[in-house]
Amino acid sequence: MDSTSSLHGSSLHRPSTEQTRTDFSWDGINLSMEDTTSILPKLKRNSNAYGIGALAKSSFSGISRSMKDHVTKPTAMGQGRVAHMIEWQGWGKTPAIQPQHSHEAVRRDTDAYSDLSDGEKEARFLAGVMEQFAISEATLMAWSSMDGEDMSVNSTQETLGCNYSDNYQELMESQDALAQAPMDGWPHSYVSQGMYCLGSSDAWEASDQSLIASPATGSYLGPAFGDSQPSLHEMGPSQPASGYSAQEPSSLLGGDTDWAPGVGGVDLAGGPAEEEKRKKMRGAGTWSPSPHARTPRCPPLSAGRCLTSHPQACSPLMRRKARPTTSFLPLLTQPSTPA
């Protein structure tokens, strides 16, 4: 009786257990909850590590089964989804068959994949993932090598730039040392550098405009200035230098003629002969009343006259700054002290 009652109870218990076993459907994914539902009552009675492990295992099994059914499904591969791109080994190769047979080839491949077992599908899936990781690693290594080459090229360019800057600094220091040299040896060194004209045939034209300075104060005076005219310290403040007319400083001083006596247009020192010479030189383009006009020109004087007429206004530092080292007006208005 007890055995029959126990059997009857068991028979009554089985349908109730089967009724509690349901299938959960969510967005087309059939997740079987049989194992989880059967384990839950046991966990309530005996909550131990074994029961928790069994629940975790059953949950993982359900998730993996859903992934196999819906992610690695052959229909998804046939439709060209991401799973097909990961799993299929020959996705990047160009097909050797004709285009009209491509659909048949895809169908055969799909059938062949469907015939594989679960272990073979998992192995194929892992092989595809490892291949993708290998491709990514190789790409990263190639990028890192290219970055290393770029860094080496940049370092080489920086080294060349440093060498250029050092050479430029040495050049500037040598020019400054030359500018600070005594005036005794200036003609030979400057003539050797090609900064002065040595002939009297034609006017000298400089190719580099950065080395051109304003003409010196005595460069456009008459050729007989050193022979026939008195020195600057013997002239008074009101006596102008030889070779100037009363109206010529007006262009330099902005039209102010109160500084020099005399009538405009009359040469006070040279006379008509000197005025005629200056007109000829002005027509030839080698003379200007202003020291800042026609800077590339040098008067066609002899070598000695050209080298000794303006030594104080032709230092390398002055040529670099393009301005004379001595002022023009003090030489005319103030007597210089004898050495």
Swiss-Prot record:
The modification Phosphoserine is found at residues 47, 114, 117, 327. This is Protein FAM131B. Residues 239-250, 324-339 have a biased composition (Polar residues). PANTHER family: PROTEIN FAM131B, PROTEIN FAM131B-RELATED. Residues 1-22, 222-339 are annotated as: Disordered. The modification Phosphothreonine is found at residue 325. InterPro entries: FAM131. Belongs to the FAM131 family.
